Amino acid sequence: MRTAIIAALIAVTGTLCMAETTPLAEPGYELAYGESAEFAFTPTGQYGSVRLVYDVRMQFPRAAGSTYVMAWEVNGKPLNAAATRTSVRLLNKPLQFTMASGLEIGWAQGNTWRAVYSPDFELVQGTGAGGMQVEQVDPYRFVIDITDMVTRGEENTITLLHRGRVMDLKRAFPDMDPTLELVFRELAFDLSDEPTAITGLVDDADEFSADRVMLQRPATCDIGGVASVAGSGGLSIRLPDLDLRVSSRFSWEGGGFNGFAADERGAQPEWVVRKDTGDEDGATIVGTARDYRVERTVRFVDDHVAIEDRLVNTTDRDIGLAFDNRLEPVGSEVLQAYLCGNPDPAMVSLRGFENPTVFVRGNEAGCGLVALDDVYRIQAEMYWEDGAGIRSDVFCLPAGGEYTVEWAIYPITRPDYFDFINIVREDLDVNFTIPGQFQFGLPSAADMTPEAIRTMIEERDLAVFSTGTWANTGGDPPYYHGAQSLEAEHLHERFRRACENLRAVAPEVASLIYIHTFINLHEDTPERFPDSLITNADGTPYINPGYTSRIGMPFYYCYPALDNSYFDAMKRLVDLCLDDDEIGADGIYWDEVEMISPKRSYDRWDGYSAELDDEHRIARKFGDPHLLSLDAKVALVEHIRSKGGTLIGNSCPRTRTMQDMHFPRFVETAREWYPARAHLYSPISLGDHKTVSDFDTLLDDIRLKLMWGTVYYYYSRPAHPYPTITRHMFPFTPVELHRGWVLGEERLLTAVPGTFSLGDDDPVTVCWYDADGALADHVGEERVEGGKRLVRLDLAEGEMAVIERR
């Protein structure tokens, strides 16, 4: 909502002998919850850099942490905390900070910046803030270099949005009525004599045009020509204008790290590396330490390097064994790095997400690294520290045990992240068919007329209609989850009636019932499922604090395992949903398959996870809920399929085992970059319910998801004045993902202009949607060249199109 527009029309002349600070607003300026403001200024004269300077807090009666609540733009472009991996905009403090509680977080994500909850400009820096204290840096003050985003001698604009309403921040404080306005002690810009910190800019904005031919198979290379294995066990990758060293390190108890092509200063005296074999197809390297052995097999496979590290515990005790594999530039500059598909140069670490990759790019080439095996993917932390890598800080091995870590390196002769992703997708065999459009709201079909059901289906080309969470509106309890859902008999009947009504009108549309295999809302959950509880380190049951506070009942978490009682309850829940004499639905919508709030359970060990102390010894073992439940989840998928059930999931796979089950899964998109989490599986983004409020914002969301290389599933369901592009989105069998367009076997969808092809000369139909989302009377220009039908689409801003096989 842009209701607060403030014009600060200022012309300032700076000199090289002194810095000039000019207010954009008066001291004490406040921006109300959910509002936005615009400030205009004109820098003139001689200066070295232009800086946005401010002190800010979000009004709150106590220290309560911080959140990404401010969205800044300069001249309509997002203001991020860094321009490239080597050009940081935030000048007065590091990109990351640590609270007194030990939590390490960043000051910005994309163009959204943190503000601390505080009643004044002192509390958060002092001990009175408790675990929320930020002691090492000033949490209120920000100095940001915007030189490259500003035009000298012309009017420039800075825009600020308070994202509180979009985030629904007040919902987090149900027993209070906080105002949450942003309060500025200072809001100004500096013309400084200091030179700008921004150099080596990367133009990530593709030059889209109708005449650009979008035939872009991945720019692979002959791996033997660019990769070599060193005697130290590491690898060298030599690409145009991008030389990289691939190094690995493995912790040892009581000290530092042993390594392959890594810094040897922290290695054990006993650490010995030998290269057993090596030829044009790869090599075998063995590293021997006091407590373990690393047997590395390197294979050159066409366009990539496949690496297996067999880790063997040679002792009769459990050992900690953190490990790290990374890409380091050697005499080259990495201009951009993607972590989990996120290109934000201010992001230095990500963990717990589904896209276990890092990708670095120079001017002419790029290189990616991907974790492959189950444990590596679950434990992976993707990071940037003068190089990009994937590490595990929690890996351990049982006495006499072993485990094989698998990963791969993909050099690309074009600096294109999507080239890397498309090759990996082929190798992972994840280009399976997404059958059709999905939507929540199935219970409403219990009360809808046949005509209303048919209109809705045709308008959105629905193939799947699903219930959401089992909301018991106005009842007690207010929600049902997990095994507790077996007792919601009145909802069973409503769901059954909805399925029957849908089937009578559109038997081709699948009815799905929501399940969650971790959350359970029985008040006596600990007594019902003592063998299945996710527990805290002190042995108490984990209870989600946010849900518990908001809903008013304890949100316990259990996990299914083949040998525990919760798995049996989940099978009974599936039977209830699918059996003809029960609800009788066509399938299951499985929420949060691999994305839940508790990351650890201390009730049992998964065999490979432990908290390690500063000397890499095991401090406490734990079980990752997704490793503990892995076999049971596979069995549950097989149980659903044995009943003929359709299956769709929320969150993409975080293990190769679940990846190979091949059923459509989407990712939620509360942050702009979240569609990238789906890049290594079914590339489906669920709509952002926080920003989609009407048909226009729905169209914006669909375009945004296409810009991230994904197709679209509905979350919010605003009224449609007419059918739009989602009607022609499925079925979709992915072939290639790109920025702004996606290619499938059946169709191509684009939000950018270009000359496109489905790869052959088959006849096609073009569905062209104007900026208002309506089907337009345009078909593009067609020609056939080299056996390929090319379709020129001169899309204007906001337009989208589909090219379908006839």
Q: What positions do the PLM features span?
A:
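Active-site-adjacent "subsite" loops/lids of carbohydrate-active enzymes
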Residues: 494, 498-503, 510-582
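Active-site-proximal substrate-binding groove within the catalytic cores of carbohydrate-active enzymes
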Residues: 397-404, 625-806
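An acidic-aromatic substrate-binding cleft motif
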Residues: 203, 410-489, 500, 507
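Polysaccharide-binding surfaces and accessory modules of carbohydrate-active proteins
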Residues: 197-248, 255-290, 294, 298-380
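Asparagine-centered strand-capping/turn motif at beta-strand->loop junctions
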Residues: 43, 162, 311-315, 750, ...
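Beta-strand-rich recognition domains
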Residues: 20-208
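Beta-strand-rich recognition/accessory modules
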Residues: 207-208, 244-264, 284-289, 301-306, ...
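Active-site neighborhood of glycoside hydrolase catalytic domains
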Residues: 565-656
